[in-house]
Regions:
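A generic membrane alpha-helix/interface feature
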Residues: 1-3, 167
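Eukaryotic scaffold repeat domains enriched in small/polar residues
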Residues: 16-296
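Sec-dependent N-terminal signal peptides
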Residues: 3-12
Length: 296
């Protein structure tokens, strides 16, 4: 029953609490003459290095936690970057939203797996063979993975760790288990899947077979989500309100940070969020063409 709480009153009561974080100005040290494009995705690896997936000339850029440039993968075969996760295997799993595909890459940029993108043709909502503007990926404890699909389709796709299709669920709508722009997915330590139902402005929770467990409403528009196990919290970027939000496991807002703007610490279309092992938070922005780092 606790998962079913909409948390309307609790969210209102707790939303004024500001998260105890401050921005690290000019965190990312790009090589001279370089710039990001629209930053659609950010992820941290097992060494707390940071990967930025962007729509500029250097598609994937790696930094250490202090913002030191490590390397760039500029020849990645994608039409338009979107989501990124570092898998339990240490490889990079990226979503090409315009190419309707998922790519698994080694940290050196070698393509290890491709799903979708057959002839760059989108798949409809009933097809098990592809996507239509997919968005991101999440990994279950058994290393099976789940892809949110997406801007046009309204479903979640499950695959075995080897990339074999297992199941799918969802359709366009506002009911339980229905979606309107499935924009991100992440697991908690209990193996529950959280789905950012962006245009419905809620997060839905499922088991690994697609059984509906609950929903969180009155939280804003979830564009990007990540789970931070030491706090047992979900961190979210609310792109409609240009802010960062922290949620407890009852779906209550326990803190927010940020507002609209271009100055350090402000947001303009925050699109993706990642939390490293120390609790530092990284936010990728579409309109501001940057990734900001926040620390306590």
């Amino acid at each position: 029953m606790r998962l079913m709480i909409a948390a309307a009153f609790a969210s209102i009561a707790l939303a004024q609490s500001e998260l105890p974080y401050h921005v690290v100005p000019d965190w990312a040290k790009l090589p001279a003459g370089w710039n990001f494009g629209e930053c659609s995705g950010v992820a941290v690896d097992h060494n707390d290095n940071v990967w930025v997936f962007n729509r500029g000339p250097h598609t994937l850029i790696e930094f250490d936690r202090n913002g030191k440039f490590l390397k760039a993968l500029s020849e990645i075969p994608v039409k338009s970057s979107h989501g990124i996760r570092v898998g339990p295997d240490g490889n990079l799993w990226i979503i090409d939203v315009a190419g309707h595909k998922m790519l698994k890459l080694s940290p050196e940029g070698r393509v290890l797996m491709v799903i979708g993108g057959v002839g760059d043709a989108p798949a409809d909502n009933d097809s098990p063979d592809g996507f239509n503007r997919p968005t991101n990926i999440a990994f279950a404890p058994d290393r099976s993975f789940f892809i949110s699909d997406g801007y046009v389709n309204s479903r979640v796709m499950k695959y075995s760790k080897n990339g074999d299709f297992v199941t799918k669920w969802g359709r366009k709508g506002k009911g339980d288990g229905e979606f309107d722009l499935v924009h991100d997915v992440v697991f908690d330590k209990r193996g529950r899947l959280y789905v950012a139902d962006r245009s419905n402005e809620r997060i839905q929770i499922f088991d690994q077979n697609g059984k509906f467990l609950g929903k969180w409403t009155n939280i804003g528009a979830p564009w990007g989500i990540d789970y931070y196990a030491p706090e047992d919290s979900i961190y979210m970027v609310d792109g409609r309100n240009d802010r960062m939000v922290r949620l407890n496991m009852e779906g209550q807002i326990t803190g927010t940070l940020g507002s609209h703007g271009r100055a350090p610490g402000k947001f303009f279309y925050p699109h993706s969020i990642a939390v490293d092992s120390t609790g530092a938070i990284y936010v990728a922005e579409i309109r501001n063409w940057r990734v900001q780092k926040f620390v306590k």
